[in-house]
Amino acid sequence: MSRGILVFSEQDEGNYELLTKASEFTSQLGEVYALVLGQKEQVTIQSLVQYGAKRILTVPGVDPNTLDAESIAFVLSEIAKNSGPDILLIRSSRLGKEIAGRVAQKLGAGCVTDAISLEIKGPDLVAQRYTLGGNTISSEVIMTTKKVISVMPRSFEARPGQSAGAAEVKELAIPSPRVEMVERRKKTSESNNVESADNLICVGQGISRKEDLVIINEFCVALHAELGCTRPLAADFHWVSEERMVGISGKKCKPKLHVSIGVSGQIQHTVGIMNSKVIVAINKDKDAPIFKIADYGIVGDLYQVVPEFTRRIKAART
């Protein structure tokens, strides 16, 4: 039997998602640990308990924003060696994936990155992840005793109430980093809520010109929705910020309502919207793959359909 699960994310929301999932496995895999970097208020510690943490390990007196992946990996690996947890769940951000690889190397452990689901099958913890460019889903089992898994953001729902009572809190020390942070520059990017939006509108190559995005933006305003896009519009055409790219190489979203406009529906994009509560697709190609996953489909020219939607929504609200 595993001696526990250690959870780490540089963001509170990621911690809550991973803790919720880890709590489902306590009877089979042992207690849930959480690592906290820097000084945290008591309310934050209590939140970790509410989401399932039974043991909280803190490293006070450090600025988590200045710690490099190696320093964090060292702490995680030392916890796994000395405190007991055999399974490490790490949020699969850019930093998280680097940390996961470093921790696995230090522990001599197997590592799965970008997992989208976790389940117990017999004696095994099975992780599923997209492979072959998102065209297939692979089920993978790590055979080493220590196991490192990085989990894609928003793969699980964060649910409080997983645990009650107090948790054991223990302070740890961290050695001086071998890498010194000389300067930190914030990347200039527009602010958006693509990942957390209740309503999300994604536009694809069905839009002919950058100037035509105005009709999509008007629709977003009318529907109180965030704008997302497929990879070509952001990475190839540069019509939309890459911060709004949805799919296997972009954001993973769980809106209550997702409207897909001029999107063909290739798997590289749809993996980012699979968890939407309701999907509405607008495409003039009746055979577009997007209709296979849509709850509602409209076969029509987006240049006619979208403005009409906008007009009717505005009329209904006046």
Feature annotation, model-predicted:
Residues 1-318:
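N-terminal glycine-rich FAD/FM-binding segment characteristic of electron-transfer flavoproteins
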